[in-house]
């Protein structure tokens, strides 16, 4: 016996948005998907390098290990 009503609703034409622009259509359990990165702007696929630090992880690492970034060193030299 199979159980009824246990599977999520499936949308064949889910629109995927990146930076407010429609970038592709896929199948999903949600009607719309909003993403920060997709294959059209990911550094691996575009060949460009971009630092993605949305939550301050670089600063947290620098503080944790008492390291200074180049900007901090330059500002201290100017003083």
UniProtKB/Swiss-Prot annotation:
Keyword Ribosomal protein among UniProt keywords: yes
Function (record text): Binds the 23S rRNA.
Subcellular location: Plastid, Chloroplast
Lineage of producing organism: Eukaryota, Rhodophyta, Florideophyceae, Rhodymeniophycidae, Gracilariales
PROSITE patterns hit by this protein: RIBOSOMAL_L31 (PS01143)
GO biological processes: translation
Similarity-based family: Belongs to the bacterial ribosomal protein bL31 family. Type A subfamily.
Domain of life assignment: Eukaryota
SUPFAM superfamilies recorded: L28p-like
Keyword rRNA-binding: yes
Matches recorded under HAMAP family: Ribosomal_bL31_1 (MF_00501)
Name listed for the protein in its UniProt record: Large ribosomal subunit protein bL31c
GO molecular function, one term: rRNA binding
Gene from which the chain derives: rpl31
Keywords associated with the record: Chloroplast, Plastid, Ribonucleoprotein, Ribosomal protein, RNA-binding, rRNA-binding
């Amino acid at each position: 016996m199979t159980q009824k009503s246990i599977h999520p609703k499936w949308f064949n034409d889910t629109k995927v948005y990146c930076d407010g622009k429609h970038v592709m259509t896929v199948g999903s359990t949600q009607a719309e998907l909003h993403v920060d990165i997709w294959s059209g702007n990911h550094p691996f696929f575009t060949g460009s390098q971009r630092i993605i630090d949305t939550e301050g992880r670089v600063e947290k690492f620098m503080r944790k290990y008492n390291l200074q970034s180049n900007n901090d060193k330059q500002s201290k030299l100017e003083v």
